[in-house]
Amino acid sequence: MLHNGNAEITGCAAGVTALEIPAEIDGSPVTAVGDSAFLKQQKLQTVSLPDSVQSIGSQAFSGCINLQEITVPSGTQSVSNSAFSGCTNLEKAVLGDSVETLGSSVFSGCESLAEVQLSANLQKMGGSVFQNCTALKTVAIPEQVQTLGGSTFSGCSRLYQVKLPAKMTEIQSCAFEDCPKLETLTLPESLTTLGYGAFQNCSGLQNISLPEQVTEVGDYAFAHCTALEQAAVSGNVLTLGKNMFCDCRRLAEVTLAEGLTELGNSMFLDCVSLQAVTIPDSVTQIGESTFSGCTDLQHVTLPQNLKQIGGNAFRNCSSLTAVAFPEKLKSIGNEAFSGCSGLQEALLPDATDTLGYSVFYGCTSLERVRLSDEITELGQTVFRQCKKLPEITLPKELTTIGESTFFSCDGFTRVEIPDGTQRIGSNAFSYCTNLKEVVIPKSVTQIGGAFESFAGCDSLTDVYYAGSEEDWNKIRFCTTLDKILKVRIHFNGELSVTTTTPAGTTTATETTATTTVTTATEPVVPFMKGDVDGDGKIDSSDVFAAMLYVAYTAVGRAGNLTDDQMQAADIDESGSIDSTDVYYLLYYIALNGAGVRSTWADVVK
């Protein structure tokens, strides 16, 4: 094909094995090999290109599976996208020094390519140029190249040595992803940007140091580099990406530079060899799951300007024994220290006003806790199974104790709930087996929710209530089975031994002066979640009642449940009763029947 007096090669006959392209055709110089000119010429083995060729088009030789060697002539300036992609038997490629531009995926999938000589004047490389070149072992990027495109060497499973140019400023996403033989790499001092997953799954990489000029590091940059032992993050980086070093299982030493303001989510997730880390004072926020699963982490120095610790930040850091919380810390997210079984104390500063749920769940060695008086609510399971915690002083401004907040805190013998607290949630103190005394203020209006608050507190003998017996009987209890209703109640500081009985009967009341018989006022007992038939317990009859309701309503019949019973049957609180609620009922009964103490919060997730 002729264009402006120049000839472009557009193809050849099928089945050709050797191809020699002439320098001119009918007096017109051959300057280009057109797009897809020899696409999938599967018998083609050798190609000779003249120096007159200035450009090689997209997919020009793509899929030529028997082509073994290619020399791009000295006159060629550009090689377009996928020009030699999928040439699975191509072993050697030499690019003349006039080549300035390589398009994307030029040699992608050339799985036999072991030797590459790039043009000394190469300036631009597209993404995926050598993607999945599984035989490639070494390569030197020419000095004029400033950007390494995305996935350039992704999947080069034998690549072990790469020389990067001194002037390179950017390594784009997944550039070296899945290069397991790459053990060492020196990043150029001019580098400013490291893209998403740039070295992800480089399982042989042993150490890395980010240069001073780096300002941006993408998510997963070094994720799953399982041999990485040392990492230094320096320079002007303000934010480190999510999962940056996640699953770097040998990472034992990390240096973080001053200037960072945030540690990204899951940054060191499951770095099981990391033993100590000092976080720069410039950091104000630690993301979610940042150090989660760092089971060898023993020492962490939190920055003085830290304001927020994200959810799961130190979850299951079982070797962590102590943490010094800085004075400016405002909030700690859900499960932040859950499963830190070695943590012995948690002394929170006055500024901390928010604790998420399960923050210290399963901290079985925790013996000392200080809470800020600014905290108004303790969420569900915050201190669940903190079995060694002997006591706790609750915040003065506390209004709500959530579900299972102190579940199975066996060290408690006495608990004083502060004045102003209004609600004590389901299982809040359940199975605190050594709890003997509880002080409850007059401000409390509800004890329990979907379940009782003091179930399994077999040592509980005395409750000291600030109000009168009349006030006590106005409190909403989830069930008359709650242990707290079976012990001595001290009203207004006066000892009373009461027995709660059904409405219409009497309660004997003893005081130090006289013994009187008074009419009992049954506590207000709303529905109990799961107790569909209203008999005060949760068992198979409740499952049957719920199933019957679902079956009846499915065929247009009345379900025959009262409003309270329907509310009790709506386990997931979706506003309707269906097979999901029946499943949750069965699951709850099975767990508790097997001896696994569980709440509705454990079942409905």
Task: Spell out what each predicted region is.
Residues 5-10, 15, 378, 533-547:
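Extracellular/luminal Pro/Thr/Ser-rich low-complexity repeat and linker "mucin-like" segments
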Residues 7-8, 18, 555-556:
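Short, solvent-exposed loop/turn elements at domain surfaces
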Residues 34-37, 57-60, 80-85, 103-106, ...:
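Consensus positions within tandem repeat domains that build extended binding/scaffold surfaces
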